[in-house]
């Protein structure tokens, strides 16, 4: 993220900081750092889960508002969609106004984090013209892989939809940032991890947002990137528009993290043939391991049944020995 020139505007607690980005893009990590530094993200937050054991840091009121509007538009509540227009019913607009009024009255620097906000950026911008936005993105192949690991029905039946959703969210993010440069700060997930202090400095310089120092409690095991080097190459070949969108976001954020295979933005020819067969081989090895695991499980089940049968026979013999004489 490029640090903008310092603003003469004093910090205003009534101006919220809204954190959003595509699901599985590091928004929870970013929100946890902001909350630890003093940003009030809500009184009732979504509980931790297996996917986010340290917490989601999502305001339940804002979350339920987004879910309700999505369902009203015929979209799954998770927000997995590429629908270009999402209408907010009039009654829900009044609910949004009430949500904002309640949170503004709490005092201190406030805001919220909720990935689905990305689908409603124009709506919230109209309702909160002074809001500030911290927009985070993550490498598309990492997000897609993370979604697959969650084993959700949406992507299990249509895997390619995962990259479509990533593209839809991040296109909305990029378009909004370009239309509202004074109100937005864009960063890559890797910058949140490696340049946390610089990110906080940028927030202070651009938005006048004064927070405490970021807490150093990042757990690398919760944000691993141990993926096949073939994935970004295959994604670039199959979905060049999505890869180019990622490069545009990197440029806007001033990200300097290494690109796959050490290639610069001006990419060279792809060794697609080698990567296709690499992934084919990996998939075959995975299938063989699954078959071996199934074989071992079946053998263990058979052995367990035999043990249980033997145990039953032993108990029956024991009962016969201790049965009182004369008993029927």
Model-derived segments and spans:
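C-terminal lobe/tail of nucleotide-utilizing enzymes
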Residues: 221-274
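Boundary detector for helix-to-coil junctions that initiate low-complexity/charged tails
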Residues: 252-328
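A polyampholytic, Gly/Pro-enriched intrinsically disordered region
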Residues: 66-70, 155-165, 232-241
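A structural signal for well-ordered alpha-helical scaffolds and beta->alpha junctions
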Residues: 27, 55-59, 89, 93, ...
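Residue-level signal for short amphipathic helical patches enriched in basic/charged
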Residues: 25, 128-131, 307-310
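The conserved 3'-phosphoadenosine-5'-phosphosulfate
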Residues: 46-53, 179-244
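PAPS-dependent sulfotransferase catalytic core
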Residues: 1-94, 219, 295-297, 302
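PAPS-dependent sulfotransferase catalytic domain
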Residues: 75, 97-213
């Amino acid at each position: 993220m490029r640090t903008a020139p310092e603003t003469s505007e004093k910090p205003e607690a009534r101006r919220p900081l809204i954190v959003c980005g595509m699901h599985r893009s590091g928004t929870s990590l970013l929100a946890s750092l902001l909350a630890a530094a003093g940003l009030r993200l809500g009184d009732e937050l979504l509980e931790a889960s297996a996917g986010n054991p340290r917490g989601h840091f999502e305001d339940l009121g804002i979350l339920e508002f987004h879910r309700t509007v999505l369902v009203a538009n015929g979209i799954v509540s998770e927000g997995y969609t590429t629908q270009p227009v999402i209408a907010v019913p009039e009654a829900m607009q009044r609910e949004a106004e009430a949500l904002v009024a309640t949170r503004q009255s709490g005092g201190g620097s406030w805001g919220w984090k909720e990935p689905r906000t990305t689908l409603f950026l124009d709506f919230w911008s109209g309702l909160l013209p002074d809001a500030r936005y911290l927009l985070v993105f993550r490498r598309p192949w990492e997000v897609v892989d993370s979604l697959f690991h969650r084993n959700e029905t949406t992507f299990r039946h249509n895997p390619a939809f995962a990259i479509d959703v990533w593209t839809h969210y991040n296109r909305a993010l990029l378009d909004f940032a370009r239309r509202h440069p004074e109100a937005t700060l864009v960063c890559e997930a890797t910058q949140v991890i490696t340049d946390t202090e610089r990110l906080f400095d940028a927030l202070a310089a651009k938005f006048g947002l004064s927070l405490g120092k970021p807490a150093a409690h990042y757990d690398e095991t919760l944000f691993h990137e141990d993926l096949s080097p073939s994935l970004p190459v295959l994604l670039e070949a199959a979905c060049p528009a999505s890869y180019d969108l990622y490069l545009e976001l990197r440029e806007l954020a001033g990200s300097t993290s290494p690109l796959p295979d050490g290639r610069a933005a001006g990419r060279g020819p792809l060794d697609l043939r080698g990567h296709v067969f690499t992934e084919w081989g990996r998939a075959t090895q995975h299938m063989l391991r699954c078959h071996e695991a199934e074989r071992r499980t079946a053998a263990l089940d058979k052995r367990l049944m035999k043990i249980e049968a033997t145990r039953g026979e032993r108990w029956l013999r024991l009962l016969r020995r201790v049965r009182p004489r004369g008993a029927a």
